[in-house]
Design a protein with these regions (language model features):
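Radical SAM enzyme [4Fe-4S]-AdoMet core and its adjacent flexible, acidic
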Residues: 1-66, 70, 79-80, 84, ...
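Flexible mid-to-C-terminal extensions adjoining Fe-S/redox cofactors in radical SAM and related proteins
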Residues: 88-170
């Protein structure tokens, strides 16, 4: 697949791993810690062997696990314009339709700021998978709205089983 992308002229590619979220999550499809390590090694090896930029969304330049949303590196805009911390955190306080410029929203949103601090202080991985309880508390504290069309994200978060993410301190 990497070679095919190079043949097609792609200059870079992103690796994302499945996050079992939503009303019909399939946790059996999520990678085990061993499988995640195997993918991570593959990405690192391909970076030095292939003439294409390879971005692993869940690791920093030093190879340490991270949550891109906890760094402020990424946000997600829902189809309705809601500004979410990441694609699987489907809660928001702000919208692209708010009066202030986007840069102000990204930099001054108390919800986004508190999300970053919460995620960074509890894991280098995915807070949704590792600590959905804390994420639920944060959404309640801020009165963040469910940005899904099904309006079940809060219940889904509360019923989640803890799962490993990309952070593996062992």
């Amino acid at each position: 697949w990497v070679d095919r992308l190079i043949e097609l002229g792609a200059l870079y590619m992103w690796y994302h791993t499945y996050r079992p979220m939503g009303p019909e999550a399939s946790p059996e499809l999520a990678l085990s810690p061993e499988e995640q390590l195997r993918i991570r090694k593959f990405v690192v090896e391909m970076r030095v062997k292939k003439p294409i930029g390879i971005i692993d969304a869940y690791y920093d330049a030093d190879g340490k696990a991270l949550c891109p949303a906890a760094t402020g590196f990424t946000h997600h805009i829902s189809p309705w314009g809601d500004i979410e911390p990441c694609p699987i955190v489907q809660f928001a306080r702000e919208s692209i339709y708010d009066e202030r410029p986007l840069a102000d929203t990204f930099n001054n949103s108390q919800f986004l700021t508190d999300f970053r601090q919460l995620a960074a202080s509890h894991t280098r991985g995915c807070i949704v998978l590792e600590r959905p309880d804390l994420l639920h508390e944060l959404t309640v504290l801020h009165g963040a709205k469910d940005t899904t069309a099904r309006n079940t994200a809060s219940a889904e978060l509360q019923s989640m089983t803890l799962r490993p993410s990309q952070y593996n301190p062992a």
